[in-house]
């Protein structure tokens, strides 16, 4: 049977976000869902107001509403983003994506290829 999915920017998984360590990440969430949502930046040290935990660090973004996340990416690494509002349903429908914070130019060892795999199970 078909699975109804929800996607960030119309895709599942959401688009890979790639920034350099020390850069400011700015993302505007425009909620096209039939319910409130947020974005939580899993594993990143972010200001409290940017953490995406509804009713704790921010009000949930209502259907048709928007919220701009903006914060400096202090730590290099591989992270992911996902909602913290009605997480079982929203994650289960595909709302997640990869966030890569790269080290400064020349700091990382050279590699032949850099590939991101983000797996999810809808059933």
Language-model regions, residue ranges each:
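Histidine-centered copper-binding motifs that mark active-site loops
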Residues: 1-123
């Amino acid at each position: 049977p078909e699975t109804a999915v929800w996607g960030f920017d119309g895709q599942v998984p959401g688009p890979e976000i790639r920034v350099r360590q020390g850069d400011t990440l700015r993302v505007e969430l425009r909620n096209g869902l039939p319910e409130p949502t947020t974005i939580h930046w899993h594993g990143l040290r972010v200001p409290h107001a940017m953490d995406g935990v509804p009713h704790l660090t921010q009000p949930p973004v209502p259907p048709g509403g928007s919220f701009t996340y903006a914060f400096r990416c202090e730590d290099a690494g591989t992270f992911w983003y996902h909602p913290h509002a009605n997480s079982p349903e929203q994650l289960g429908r595909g709302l997640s994506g990869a966030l890569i914070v790269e080290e400064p130019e020349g700091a990382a060892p050279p590699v032949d290829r850099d590939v991101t795999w983000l797996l999810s199970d809808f059933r």
